[in-house]
UniProtKB/Swiss-Prot annotation:
Role noted for this protein: Component of the COP9 signalosome complex (CSN), a complex involved in various cellular and developmental processes. The CSN complex is an essential regulator of the ubiquitin (Ubl) conjugation pathway by mediating the deneddylation of the cullin subunits of the SCF-type E3 ligase complexes, leading to decrease the Ubl ligase activity of SCF. The CSN complex plays an essential role in oogenesis and embryogenesis and is required for proper photoreceptor R cell differentiation and promote lamina glial cell migration or axon targeting.
Domain PCI residue range list: 204-373
One term under GO cellular component: COP9 signalosome
SUPFAM superfamilies: Winged helix' DNA-binding domain
Sample GO molecular function, one term: transcription cis-regulatory region binding
Compartments in which it is found: Cytoplasm; Nucleus
PROSITE patterns named in the record: PCI
InterPro entries, per the entry: CSN4_HTH, PCI_dom, PSMD12-CSN4-like_N, PSMD12/CSN4, WH-like_DNA-bd_sf, WH_DNA-bd_sf
Keyword Secreted in record: no
Protein name as annotated: COP9 signalosome complex subunit 4
GO BP: any one term: compound eye photoreceptor cell differentiation
Subunit organization: Component of the CSN complex, probably composed of CSN1b, alien/CSN2, CSN3, CSN4, CSN5, CSN6, CSN7 and CSN8. Interacts directly with CSN7.
Length: 407
């Protein structure tokens, strides 16, 4: 054996055959396999590939004791992680293929190789391939017992990888598996990661108000970096704006409007107009649109973008506070959409209980039901108080001495 100069395929095959019939102790036999593996790794190019393939085939052979083959396959897994990605990926797949007939005997070793393969795919942004490799690990059904933290972390990673591949359906499947485990761990880091993934799944699935609530919760978690907390708050604001108009969104708008941190976000202007129930024009949405992710720019069933649909509904609710009734034509002009579309949106919101009113088809008029005035006045007074407080705070910063004299 020439440890410093590699080994030929013929010589390797001969030595492997000799080791099968080795009569010494398991420890001595394992040491000889390790020395032979070390020699194979000194090869280069095709000789390295051929040598490792031959070595793997030999050690997973049923004639080699499991005590030995498991140890040496662990060593092979460690060495695979040191090779260049392309070479390591090819040899990892080869190893998994050869082990497959006896996979139950090598669960731990196979899992290690799969985790390694997933990291390679992830580094190369091959998200779906990385997820698929991890899905192949029998976390619940295998003989090996995995810790709650390992299973939870793996499910969350699979969900995140599917999200990166824009497959929210598969991501939700693994988030649901993770949800059964997240209460069993004391790891705050994993719990936060679960909440992040869950919020993203809700976001991708267009369950915007639920996503906004989760993002808003994350924005208060001390374990999360300050910059990440502000990112979560921004996402909460974006999802709230994109959500369907109704009581849930109104409550979320109020929560965010009262959060002083939101005043520093680029989308604050839209938040303010929505909370104060003001009409929003299409020209005012350009800055907000630039904040949207690709999945948030998708079209709805009527061809409108998600944002346009949300703004149409908001403007319709705002109009219901200004008018007792309005014709389809006037409503369409107010919302800057065709009258037929305006009628359809109004009809849907009334049917779903998100707006009070009724439609007179014969007269082509939407009638808005009278609201109690006191709650409206309360909101308007509350809004005015917030704005006055904001002005006072700005004066205090700019002219503290003048404010002291007033006191």
């Amino acid at each position: 054996m020439a440890a410093n100069y590699g080994i030929s395929t013929a010589a390797l095959r001969s030595q492997l055959m000799g080791l099968i019939n080795f009569t010494g102790t398991h420890k001595d036999q394992a040491d000889k396999y390790r020395q032979l593996l070390k020699t194979v790794l000194t090869n280069t190019g095709q000789e390295l590939i051929d040598g490792l393939r031959l070595f793997v085939e030999a050690i997973v052979n049923e004639h080699v004791s499991l005590v030995i083959s498991r140890q040496i396959l662990n060593d092979v897994g460690s060495e695979l992680s040191k090779l260049p990605d392309d070479l390591s990926k090819m040899l990892s797949h080869f190893t998994l293929e050869k082990v497959n007939p006896r996979v139950i005997s090598f669960e731990e070793q196979v899992a290690g190789i799969r985790f390694h393969l997933a990291n390679i795919y992830e580094r190369n942004q091959q998200w779906r391939d990385a997820a698929t490799v991890l899905v192949g690990i029998p976390l619940e059904t295998g003989q090996k017992q995995y810790s709650v933290e390992c299973k939870l972390g793996t499910y969350l990673k699979i969900a995140r990888l599917y999200l990166e591949d824009n497959d929210s359906v598969q991501a939700e499947l693994f988030i649901n598996r993770a949800s059964l485990l997240q209460a069993e761990t004391n790891s705050e880091e994993l719990q936060v990661l679960y909440k992040v993934c869950y919020a993203r799944v809700l976001d991708y699935r267009r369950k915007f108000i639920e996503a906004a609530q989760r993002y808003n919760e994350l924005s208060y978690r001390k374990i999360v970096d300050q910059g990440e907390r502000m990112t979560a708050l921004k996402k909460a604001l974006i999802c709230t704006v994109l959500a369907s108009a109704g009581q849930q969104r109104s409550r979320m708008l109020a929560t965010l409007f009262k959060d002083e941190r939101c005043q520093h976000l680029p989308a604050y202007g839209i938040l303010e107009k929505m909370y104060l129930e003001r009409i929003i024009r299409r020209s005012e949405l350009q800055e907000f649109e630039a904040l949207l992710q690709d999945h948030q720019k998708a079209a709805t069933s009527d061809g409108s973008s998600i944002l346009d649909r949300a703004v149409f509904e908001h403007n319709l609710l705002s109009a219901s506070k200004l008018y007792n009734n309005i014709t389809f034509e006037e409503l369409g002009a107010l919302l800057d959409i065709p009258a037929v579309k305006a009628e359809k949106i109004a009809s849907q919101m009334i049917t779903e209980g998100r707006m009070n009113g009724h439609i007179d088809q014969i007269s082509a008029i939407v009638h808005f039901e009278n609201r109690e005035l006191l709650p409206q006045w309360d909101r308007q007074i509350q809004s005015l108080c917030y704005q006055v407080n904001s002005i006072i705070e700005k004066i205090s910063v700019a002219e503290p001495d003048w404010m002291d004299n007033l006191n």
